[in-house]
Amino acid sequence: MTHHETSAVDASSASMHVRSTIDVPPDLVVGLLGSADENLRALERMLSADLHVRGNTVAFSGEPADVALAERAISELVAIVASGHPLTPEVVRHGVAMLVGTGNESPAEVLTLDILLRRGKTVRPKTLNQKRYVDAIDANTIVFGIGPAGTGKTYLAMAKAVNALQTKQVTRIILTRPAVEAGERLGFLPGTLSEKIDPYLRPLYDALYDMMDPELIPKLMSSGVIEVASLAYMRGRTLNDAFIVLDEAQNTTAEQMKMFLTRLGFGSKVVVTGDVTQIDLPGGARSGLRAAVDILEHIDDIYVAELASVDVVRHRLVSEIVDAYAEYEEHDLGMNRAARRASGARNRR
């Protein structure tokens, strides 16, 4: 790939404009631009510099900083295509967002890290924070993954668990959740205990079937290699040589969280995931996830990975919905505080 030096267009104006060009290897142009130029359009929407493509040459013009960002974006996207990974508008958006956010990391390195491959489908991190989260799982025995819905915290943890089993780093996978959800308590639901708990574990089953051969899963579950169970079934056990994922951990009590973490045995790894803004515990009880992070985050070999709305990898509207609700709840909290202060002032008169 050839880069031609930038040249000043209007050096006398208050805001200098520059131009530059990059020659893309001819065999990579189609992959870079995408079907019907969909990748180019996604790139143009995210960049302030003007982009023009002629043959295998990409020309840029605009403010120096904008052109520099566009040049680096093209270079990183070309590297992704050259590595053999498919480039999509979603990958373009995540790559440019990464450059805008920090500029210190290579999107090509982050977005081409394969965690798990199955039947042509690849699981890989799509944001810088997801990459840091995955790296933390590799480097630590216990990792807390905290973030809103759609940030991939559970899916990536399960992908790492399946990979660890396939590469014989562990001999079994244990997936667990507390059986508490908004608006429902198990005692009021019909059916046996197993029938009551199963719907709460369904998201874990869904992810598992997405990552492994469906016909293999029942055999692995019947032999105990894979276990999907309510958190209550963890009590009194020591879990050796296992990859253990606790999902929806914000709905554990402090006692449950302590019980769970002390199940850790030799050769095991634990990933705890949750969203501290979605606590469904009755009576305003303090979340065991919050307590655990406060108590344990300074301990070596325990890592707290925080993901945010910028890491949401579902439909683009999901991140906007997450931000809108956070803003509304912050405003609502401020209004309630103001009302309490006003009420207190009246009572003191």
UniProtKB/Swiss-Prot annotation:
Binding of ATP, residues: G147, P148, A149, G150, T151, G152, K153, T154
This protein's record includes keyword Nucleus: no
One Gene Ontology term of the molecular function aspect: ATP binding
InterPro entries the UniProt entry points to: KH_dom (IPR004087), KH_dom_type_1_sf (IPR036612), P-loop_NTPase (IPR027417), PhoH (IPR003714), PhoH2-like (IPR051451)
Localization in the cell: Cytoplasm
UniProt keyword annotations, A-Z: ATP-binding, Cytoplasm, Nucleotide-binding
Protein name: PhoH-like protein
Pfam families linked to this entry: PhoH
Keyword Nucleotide-binding: yes
Family of the protein in this entry: Belongs to the PhoH family.
Assigned GO CC terms: cytosol
SUPFAM superfamilies: Eukaryotic type KH-domain (KH-domain type I), P-loop containing nucleoside triphosphate hydrolases
